[in-house]
């Protein structure tokens, strides 16, 4: 996201909690091309000062604790980051509406919880039960409340599983499988491999967020939530197979642990609303996205 905004010659202010030397942000030298503010979403005075001093016009709320396993082990810190962080930021935006003209909030397909009908549409209830899922349901509802009550110009994005360059969480299935395959090691599948998700290339997600932000002056768009998906759901074993082929290691077999808990078995999205209202569709898709992703990890891992 930051790289694309810089390429568009935007003036970008980044709130950075942790400096990671191998991060995509650092490797691209984006610290020198943006204004970096060190801090966290839990620090409300910092957020208000940041928005005020830099006269921020568009807010992309992407910060969160995003790891399901971490949320199960540490629900309090997850809710502090994801729930408190969201209402802190939206309150700061409310108090700076003189300059803040649009806010895009990243929710998740997990906000829906376990729904009886697939694919999920935007009018499905938000029923997250497990800690991470619940945090995203809250993020979603708080954002809608700030729009309905205070007319803070908010839109909400709900994506499936994002993948692409820059993800250094090796517990996620795509980066973990790529690293294992590059090392010629069996990839680890923590579930039984049958869990179904949709996978969205990060470049398609960035395009979706920016397209949404650009169209928020339309009354039929502002205040709305949008699903973004390539609408090609895959089981875990299917996505592992796709990754292994992309790395050119089709004969490697995954080590299936069957140890997943507090996870929904099948979860994927309809992007019909985004197609019809925004004219959005994925440019890269799974195959091209994986090819670009594998190339990035090969360079990273040597």
Predicted regions, residues:
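Proline-centered turn/helix-capping motifs that create local helix->coil transitions or kinks
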Residues: 98, 104, 114-116, 151, ...
């Amino acid at each position: 996201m930051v790289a694309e905004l810089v390429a568009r010659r935007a003036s970008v202010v980044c709130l950075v909690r942790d400096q990671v030397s191998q991060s995509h942000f650092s490797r691209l030298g984006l610290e020198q091309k943006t204004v970096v503010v060190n801090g966290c979403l839990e620090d409300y005075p910092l957020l208000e000062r940041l928005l005020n001093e830099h006269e921020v016009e568009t807010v992309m709320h992407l910060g969160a604790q995003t790891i399901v396993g971490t949320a199960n082990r540490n629900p309090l810190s997850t809710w502090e980051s994801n729930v408190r962080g969201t209402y802190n930021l939206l309150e700061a935006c409310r108090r700076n509406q003189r300059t803040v003209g649009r806010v895009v909030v990243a929710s998740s397909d997990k906000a829906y919880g376990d729904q009886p009908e697939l694919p999920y549409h935007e009018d499905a209830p938000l029923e997250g039960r497990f800690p991470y899922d619940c945090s995203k349901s809250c993020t979603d509802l708080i954002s809608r409340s700030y729009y309905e009550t205070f007319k803070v110009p908010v839109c909400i994005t709900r994506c499936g599983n994002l993948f692409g360059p820059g993800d250094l969480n090796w517990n996620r299935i795509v980066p973990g499988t790529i690293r294992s395959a590059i090392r010629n090691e069996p990839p680890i599948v923590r579930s039984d491999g049958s869990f179904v998700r949709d996978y969205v290339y990060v470049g398609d997600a960035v395009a979706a967020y920016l397209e949404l932000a650009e169209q928020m002056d339309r009354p039929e768009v502002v205040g709305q939530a949008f699903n973004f998906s390539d609408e090609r759901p895959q089981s875990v074993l299917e996505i592992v197979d796709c990754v292994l082929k992309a790395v050119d290691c089709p004969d490697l077999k995954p080590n299936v642990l069957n140890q997943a808990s507090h996870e929904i078995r099948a979860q994927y999205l309809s992007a019909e609303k985004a197609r019809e209202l925004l004219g959005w569709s994925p440019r890269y898709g799974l195959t091209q996205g994986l090819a670009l992703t594998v190339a990035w990890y090969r360079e990273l891992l040597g």
